[in-house]
Amino acid sequence: MLISIAFLLVLYLLNYSSFRMLKSFLTLKKISQYAYLWFFILLSIGEAAFVFYRNIMPSHLFVLTSACSFVSFIIFILSLSFYGFSYSIEKIDFLHSRRKSLKNFLKLGFYLALLGYFWRGFYEGLARPKIKETPIYLDKLDKELKIILLTDMHVGSLLQKDFVDYIVEEVNQKEVDMVLIGGDLVDESIEKVKSFLLPLNNLKSTHGTFYVPGNHEYYHGIEPILSFLDTLNLTILGNECVHLGGINLCGVYDYFARKRQNFAPDIDKALKKRNESKPTILLAHQPKQIRSLKESHSVDLVLSGHTHAGQIFPFSLLVKLAQTYLHGLYKHSPTTQIYVSSGAGYWGIPLRFLAPSEIAYLRLLPKNQA
């Protein structure tokens, strides 16, 4: 609750600051000031509704209210940038003669930047995810292994069966050895999305489909979600390890549940039955799960999602602070690499900016082929 209140206060501070800056550099008339004031009041009401009632509100209201915080942040960043330009115009002497024309240009630039940001954001957000290929070299690997990593599909009120059908069709074209689903598959109660998930039964690969939950599965009822997914043509890796394709494939429950008694992540348990002569891959939804690894765990590769690559720049800067690894392939230690997918779907409104979605196609190769 305290974190929620703190988050809301930060949003209110952003809204207040944005209003003051807009009022200053746009030199708003009285009627325009009232219009902007009511806009920020409505924005703040939407943010309060989201913070306190997001888990019980209808899906269309969830999408609408979740958009409010995105809008606040974007307007604040643009307002701060253009306020800085406006301040410079006032302070730089040789610009005084052109001050009026420059300020008019600045006003136009602000509205164009705002329009362009949202146009590009919705364009990227609504675009279908493309397959992104990445080679990864591993010690102890005998032969090439082709993997599809799907994360953050967020199947729910906006991303439905047609989206899952598209994903399955794209994946099946690659003829891979295994498909890994790295959490946040579901973003509604399972009763609302059962029919949307059925196409997952059609995923094709040599060794099958494997899944670990993300934090959103816990939000919407982890037990009924796992019970339903257990009826599909996939294997749930809940702190478990399987041996196939010349590797140890291990999976853990999500970091979000680390203080729960049930469905909590347990890396020691997940890795207990691994074959140490083979490379070990750990499927964990959040990248920061890697902080729990010890050198003795001997994990060669961690596969994660969760970050959406920030989804909306400059949110990515905040996400990187929380998760360390944002998107792509990183070397965590001399013996451990981590790949973080930007995700196939989106959370909240269909908006992505400088963070395109992806279907990660990972080609694991013996290190001697590097």
Swiss-Prot record:
Cellular component GO terms, alphabetical: membrane
EC number: 3.1.-.-
Gene3D superfamilies to which the protein is assigned, alphabetical: 3.60.21.10
Binding note for cofactor: Binds 2 divalent metal cations.
Top-rank taxon: Bacteria
Family matches, as PANTHER family: PHOSPHODIESTERASE YAEI (PTHR31302:SF31), TRANSMEMBRANE PROTEIN WITH METALLOPHOSPHOESTERASE DOMAIN-RELATED (PTHR31302)
Protein name: Uncharacterized metallophosphoesterase HP_1044
Organism: Helicobacter pylori (strain ATCC 700392 / 26695)
Lineage, opening ranks: Bacteria, Pseudomonadati, Campylobacterota, Epsilonproteobacteria, Campylobacterales
